[in-house]
Amino acid sequence: MRSRLVLAAGLFSLLGSAVAGALTVSPAPSLSKLPTTATVVRAVTAAEGKTKVPTGSITPPLTSTGLYWTSVNPGLSNPSKPGCVINDAATTIPAVIGTSCAYGDPTSTRVVALVGDSNANAWIPALDTWGYVNNVKVVAVVHAACAPWERPWLPKDRPIWGEITERKCAVWRRSMMSKVTALSPSLVIPVGITATDKSLKMPTTAELTTALTAMVTYFTPSKVALLEPVPQFTLASSVLACVSGHRTSLDQCEVRRSAVTSNALNQVFRQVATSKKAAVIPTLNLFCGPTRCPLFVTLNAQNYLVYEDGYHISHQYAQIIGAALPLASHVK
């Protein structure tokens, strides 16, 4: 082990700008300073009682929450991988995802696959860090607005975001599932959220349960790990808008832990995991204290903004908590 990641607009459009050189990227954290799970949990708990925007440096800056990231792996010069991270209506995935879409330790024979929508993309910095530290290859195949499970409740040709439709997501999803299965990973981590556009039909609990069960069954339950869904806010812009108006009363902006645990998707995740004997990775404590889920967390004397927007965690917070992910026991 060496010494010590409207619906996807912000995350994916900023990614494109970063590749074009329009954004400055944040430096990679020092491997020797990556916090443990216990350290992150203590920091989150300590942040819960703070009501003011922290003084000093904040990463990502409030003026550039989509700031791109630099991998802890010095051999990974560009974390953006065409076809592996799709932000438009394209559906073509690289032929050899084990090479083209590799993060973490690309030379390892142990493989973890990360699949899903823009929320899966937000987890890439965390899984990249975790994989590099633990000598595991992480293969990421993600598509904006395309959940890793089927969504028969959505109209096939109605735009979800931009020109992305469920019909196009279905084409991408079939290709993703086939290529990931052929890769024979030790673990598959599917990440997604239900529709955030209220004009789109929301699934019933039964529909969501059926969809997640089918996905877990396809990948083989014993090889699936579901990350606990992270806190979400009402609108994509709601986090920053609230912080702007409540710089000394951040508790007015925070999500309560009870709201996250009672979230329909979170409950269905647990029900499906229990019935199919899949794993649920306890990540909620990396975001929420006993009562609330803070917007800012301080680690190694650096203030981190936890969220890029109302639906996505920031690249920088995802990266700094990467080594704290409790995944090791699930990867053979």
Model-based region annotation:
Residues 2-332:
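Extracellular/periplasmic envelope-modification machinery, especially enzymes
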